[in-house]
Amino acid sequence: MNPKRILLVCTGNSCRSVMAQGLMQHMLQQAGLDAVTVESSGTFAIAGMTPTRETQRVLWEAGIDCSHHRARSLTPEMIAGADLILVMEQSHLPEVLHRAPDAKGKTHLLKTYGLAAGEPVTNPNIPDPIGKPMEVYEVCFMEIREAVERVVRSLGVASE
C-alpha cells in the first residue's frame, strides 16, 4: 500500500490524533515523503477546539508546533478521501465503519499497523490521556512516536 492521504482518528481530536498527526508530518518530511497528506479527526470531537496544553507541550518539546490545530469531527467525506485510516483504540473501529462501512479494508489500529505477522502486542490501544497528569501524556507520546515511526518506515519501503 502506498497511501497519499492518511487520516488519524481518536475521540476528541485534541490529544492522541493531534500528537500522531504532528509526529507523522514531521517524520514524513524528514524521510522525503512530502507527497503524503496527513489529517486528523475525532469520533466525538467538538469542532474548533484547540489541543490540550499538555498535548501542545509534548509536541513543542519534540520541536513540533500544533497551536494552529483545531479539532474536527469525523465525517464520511473524510473517510472516503483517505487511503489509510489509523485509529487510536479498538472502540474507534466501529465508529469509522458506522460512518463508512466500505472503509473496513483501509482502517487499522495505529499501534498494530506495520507489525510483522505474529509480532506480539501487549495492548493494541493507545489510552486517552485527557484529564490525566503530564506524565501520562509523555507515555502516550512515546507510544504514538513508536507506532508512527513504524508506519513511516513502512511507507518509505512502499515508495521505493
Task: Report the location of each language-model feature.
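Short polar/charged helix/loop
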Residues: 1-160
